C-alpha cells in the first residue's frame, strides 16, 4: 500500500518480473510460497468460499473478514501475543480484510507475451527501439513467421547460419510436421525463434547507449545531405529524421528511469487485488462479476492448456503448440486492451467486455473519476457564468457555497468575538442566517484565496487562485478573460472550488497561482488572457453602429428603422435629430436614463485635432445660424466655425458603445503607464 506521508509522487511504468513476484509472493510458516494464481475459479458453488489458488484465494489475497481465516478461526489483529499469524490448516494470514484492496497475485505465463500497449499503441515503443516495421513485428508476435537463430560451428536442421536478418516467411512448409511436442520444442529452442520470445531476445540484446550514438550519427548524416530535389525522397528523409529523434528520446527515457527494454515482454502477469474486481450478490441470489474476472479466467484457461501440451502430452504437433501460444497472446491482449486488434470480445448478451484499459482511461476511469476527481472536504462545484464587473483576480462565490466552505472559520470567528458560547450555538446562528454571520464571512473571505479548477486539468493553468466575493444566486461568477486558460466557456461548464488550508498552500496560491499573474501561456509564451467568443461578439455589437457613416444612416431609406409588418413611405419618414453632448459623462448618463440607445448616433464634443483642421475633405452639409456661425458636417465629424472661419469646436459622430469602449481602453493605458512609472 502507498503511504501518502512517505511517497510524494506516483509513477507508472514497466517493472521487472522480479518486482512483480516480490509484490505478490509471501511465505507461510510451513515454508510454502504463495502468490501464483493457477486455477481459473472464483467461489465454490456450494460453500460460497473462495477456491484455493483461484482468483479470490484467501491465502494469496488475504481474508474476506478481518482476522478470520478460511477455516473460521479468529485471531485479534495486531496482538503480538496471539501466535501464529497464519492459520496452520489453511495458510490464511490473520490480518484485516482491507489487505484485499492492495495485495496482488500473479500468473506465471508458460510462454512470453508481448505487452500490447508497447506494441500496438502509437507510437510503438518496441518498433521504435528495434527499428523494424510494426507489421513485421506483429507477424512475428502472432507466430506468422519466424527468425533463424544464430548458431555457429554446429550442424543445423535448416542449414542456416548467421543473424536474425534471415527470415523464413513460411515456416510451416519449411519445417517437416513429423516432430513430436518435445522434439519440436527442442528444435525450436535450438534453431528458430518466433512469438513474443523472439521479441524478448532482440530487446535483451539491445545496448541503449549504442542506439543513441548510432541514431545521432545517422541524423547528422541525413542533415548534411540537404534536399535531393525529389519531393518524395525529401519527405522520406524528414520522416526518418523525426523517427531517429523519437528513438533517441525513448532510449534516453529508458536509461533515465532504469527500465530494461525486455520488460515490455511479460513473463509474469500481475493479478489485480480482488476488491478492485469484485463479485457482488444481487437480489435473487444472482452474482454480478467484474468483466476483468472473466478475462483473467480466459488467460488462465489458455495458459494451463499450453502447459498441458508442453508437459503431459508427447504426441501433440508443434503447429498446435504455436496456435496455443497465439491464443495466450490474444487472451492477454484482450485483458489489457479489448478491441485494440480489431473486433472486441463480447459476452453472451453481445456486450463488450471492459478491459483493464477501459477501467483506467477516460472520464469514468479509475484516475479521473476516483483519484483525480474524487470528492474532498472544503470543496464545492457549480456552473460558471460571466462576471463582467469583476476584476481579473476575483471570482464570485454564491452565498450557499461560501458559507459551507468557510463554515469552520465563521464558527471560530463567532466564538472568538463571544457571539456564540459553543459550536452548537454558532451552527444555529448560521442556519438562521443572522446578519453577523455574513459580516464575519466577509472578513474571513478577504484573507482567504480559493482555487478554481476545471476538469480535465491538462496544464497548470487548469487550476488558478482567485479572491472570492459574495454574489447572489447559485452560480460561480468568473471574469471572461481567464476562460482561455481553463478552456472554459459559459454554455453550462462546471468548475470546482477548493479552499487551501495550510500556510504553504495559501502562500503558493497568493504568490504563484493568482490569475492576474498567469497572463502568458507556459507552453509558448503567448498572451493567454485575450478576448474570445462572447467578448468578441460583444465588442462587435458595441462598436458596429457608426461604421456606415452619416450618408448611409441618414439618407438611405433601407437603413432606417423598420418594424415588423410596417412599410416605409418616403413622405412619412421623419428624421430623428441626433443629440449633442459636451462630454462622455453626459452621453452615458443619457443612456442610463434611457433617452438614447446603445447604438444611437450622437455628436460628442472633442478636442481640436490638427488632422481635422488640415483636412481637405469637402463637407456633406453646411448649417448656418442666425448669429453668423455655421456647422460644417462631414461623414464622421462636425466643425463649428465663426463668421471669420475660425474653428470654435469639433464634434465627432459616435455612439455610447464607442464611448464606453474608448474609456475602458484609456483607463487601461493610463493604469499601465502609472505602473511603469512606479517601477522606474
From Swiss-Prot:
Q: Where is Zn(2+) bound in this sequence?
A: 69, 71, 87, 90
Q: Where in the cell is it found?
A: Plastid, Chloroplast
Q: Which EC class heads this enzyme's classification?
A: transferase
Pfam families given in the database record:
RNA_pol_Rpb1_1, RNA_pol_Rpb1_2
Q: Which InterPro entries match?
A: DNA-dir_RpoC_beta_prime, RNA_pol_asu, RNA_pol_N, RNA_pol_Rpb1_1, RNA_pol_Rpb1_3_sf, RNA_pol_Rpb1_clamp_domain, RNApol_RpoC1
Transcription among the record's keywords?
yes
The source's superkingdom equals Eukaryota
User: Which reaction is catalysed here?
Assistant: RNA(n) + a ribonucleoside 5'-triphosphate = RNA(n+1) + diphosphate
As cofactor, the record names: Mg(2+); Zn(2+)
Under Enzyme Commission nomenclature, its number is 2.7.7.6
Q: Which UniProt keywords apply?
A: Chloroplast, DNA-directed RNA polymerase, Magnesium, Metal-binding, Nucleotidyltransferase, Plastid, Transcription, Transferase, Zinc
Give me the residues that bind Mg(2+), please: 489, 491, 493
User: Which Gene Ontology BP terms does the record give?
Assistant: DNA-templated transcription
What binding details are noted for the cofactor? Binds 1 Mg(2+) ion per subunit.
- One MF term in the entry's GO annotations: zinc ion binding
Database matches in SMART domains: RPOLA_N
Q: What does this protein do?
A: DNA-dependent RNA polymerase catalyzes the transcription of DNA into RNA using the four ribonucleoside triphosphates as substrates.
User: What is this protein called in UniProt?
Assistant: DNA-directed RNA polymerase subunit beta'
Amino acid at each position: 500500500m502507498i503511504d501518502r506521508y512517505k511517497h510524494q509522487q506516483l509513477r507508472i511504468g514497466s517493472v521487472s518480473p522480479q518486482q512483480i513476484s516480490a509484490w505478490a509472493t509471501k511465505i507461510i510458516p510451513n515454508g510454502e510460497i504463495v502468490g501464483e494464481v493457477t486455477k481459473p475459479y472464483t467461489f465454490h458453488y456450494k460453500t460460497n468460499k473462495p477456491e484455493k489458488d483461484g482468483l479470490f484465494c484467501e491465502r494469496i489475497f488475504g481474508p474476506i473478514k478481518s482476522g478470520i481465516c478460511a477455516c473460521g478461526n479468529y485471531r485479534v489483529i495486531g496482538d503480538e501475543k496471539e501466535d501464529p499469524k497464519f492459520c496452520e490448516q489453511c495458510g490464511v494470514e490473520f490480518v484485516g480484510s482491507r489487505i484485499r484492496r492492495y495485495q496482488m497475485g500473479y500468473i506465471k505465463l508458460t510462454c512470453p507475451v508481448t505487452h500490447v500497449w508497447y506494441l500496438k499503441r502509437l507510437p510503438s515503443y518496441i518498433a521504435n527501439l528495434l527499428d523494424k516495421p510494426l507489421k513485421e513485428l506483429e507477424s512475428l508476435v502472432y507466430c506468422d513467421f519466424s527468425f533463424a537463430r544464430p548458431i555457429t560451428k554446429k550442424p543445423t536442421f535448416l542449414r542456416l547460419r548467421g543473424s536474425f536478418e534471415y527470415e523464413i516467411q513460411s515456416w510451416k512448409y519449411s519445417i517437416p510436421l513429423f516432430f513430436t511436442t518435445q522434439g519440436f520444442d527442442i528444435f525450436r529452442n535450438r534453431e528458430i525463434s518466433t512469438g513474443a520470445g523472439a521479441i524478448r531476445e532482440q530487446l535483451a540484446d539491445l545496448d541503449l547507449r549504442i542506439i543513441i550514438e548510432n541514431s545521432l550519427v545517422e541524423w547528422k548524416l541525413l542533415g548534411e545531405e540537404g534536399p535531393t530535389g525529389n519531393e518524395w525522397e525529401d519527405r522520406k528523409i524528414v520522416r526518418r529524421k523525426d523517427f531517429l529523434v523519437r528513438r533517441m528520446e525513448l532510449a534516453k527515457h529508458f536509461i533515465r528511469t532504469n527500465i530494461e527494454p525486455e520488460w515490455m515482454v511479460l513473463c509474469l502477469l500481475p493479478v489485480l487485488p480482488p476488491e478492485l474486481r469484485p463479485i457482488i450478490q444481487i437480489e435473487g441470489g444472482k452474482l454480478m462479476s467484474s468483466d476483468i474476472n472473466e478475462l483473467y479466467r480466459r488467460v488462465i484457461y489458455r495458459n494451463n492448456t499450453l502447459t498441458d501440451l508442453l508437459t503431459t502430452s508427447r504426441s501433440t504437433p508443434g503447429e498446435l503448440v504455436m496456435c496455443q501460444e497465439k491464443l495466450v497472446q490474444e487472451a492477454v491482449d484482450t485483458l489489457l486492451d479489448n478491441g485494440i486488434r480489431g473486433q472486441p470480445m463480447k459476452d453472451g448478451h453481445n456486450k463488450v467486455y471492459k478491459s483493464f484499459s477501459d477501467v483506467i482511461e477516460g472520464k469514468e476511469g479509475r484516475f479521473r473519476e476516483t483519484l483525480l476527481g474524487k470528492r474532498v472536504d472544503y470543496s464545492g462545484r457549480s456552473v460558471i457564468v460571466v462576471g463582467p464587473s469583476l476584476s481579473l483576480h476575483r471570482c464570485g462565490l454564491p452565498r450557499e457555497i461560501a458559507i459551507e466552505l468557510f463554515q469552520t472559520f465563521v464558527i471560530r470567528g463567532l466564538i472568538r468575538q463571544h457571539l456564540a458560547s459553543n459550536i452548537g450555538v454558532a451552527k444555529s446562528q448560521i442556519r438562521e442566517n443572522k446578519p453577523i454571520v455574513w459580516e464575519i464571512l466577509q472578513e474571513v473571505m478577504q484573507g482567504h484565496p480559493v482555487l478554481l479548477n476545471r476538469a480535465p486539468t491538462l496544464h497548470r493553468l487548469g487550476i488558478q487562485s482567485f479572491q472570492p466575493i459574495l454574489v447572489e444566486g447559485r452560480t460561480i461568477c468568473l471574469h471572461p478573460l481567464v476562460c482561455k486558460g481553463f478552456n472554459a466557456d459559459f454554455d453550462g461548464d462546471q468548475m470546482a472550488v477548493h479552499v487551501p488550508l495550510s500556510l504553504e498552500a495559501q502562500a503558493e496560491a497568493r504568490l504563484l497561482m493568482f490569475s492576474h499573474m498567469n497572463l502568458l501561456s507556459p507552453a509558448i509564451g503567448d498572451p493567454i488572457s485575450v478576448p474570445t467568443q462572447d467578448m468578441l461578439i460583444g465588442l462587435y455589437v458595441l462598436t458596429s453602429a457608426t461604421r456606415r457613416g452619416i450618408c448611409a444612416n441618414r439618407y438611405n431609406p433601407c437603413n432606417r428603422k423598420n418594424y415588423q409588418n410596417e412599410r416605409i413611405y418616403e413622405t412619412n419618414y421623419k428624421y430623428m435629430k441626433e443629440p449633442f453632448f459636451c462630454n462622455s459623462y453626459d452621453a452615458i448618463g443619457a443612456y442610463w436614463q434611457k433617452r438614447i440607445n446603445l447604438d444611437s448616433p450622437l455628436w460628442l464634443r472633442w478636442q481640436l485635432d490638427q488632422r481635422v483642421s488640415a483636412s481637405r475633405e469637402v463637407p456633406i452639409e453646411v448649417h448656418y445660424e442666425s448669429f453668423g456661425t455655421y456647422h460644417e458636417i462631414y461623414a464622421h465629424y462636425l466643425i463649428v466655425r465663426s463668421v471669420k472661419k475660425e474653428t470654435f469646436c469639433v464634434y465627432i459622430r459616435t455612439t455610447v458603445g464607442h464611448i464606453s469602449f474608448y474609456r475602458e481602453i484609456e483607463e487601461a493605458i493610463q493604469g499601465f503607464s502609472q505602473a511603469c512609472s512606479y517601477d522606474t
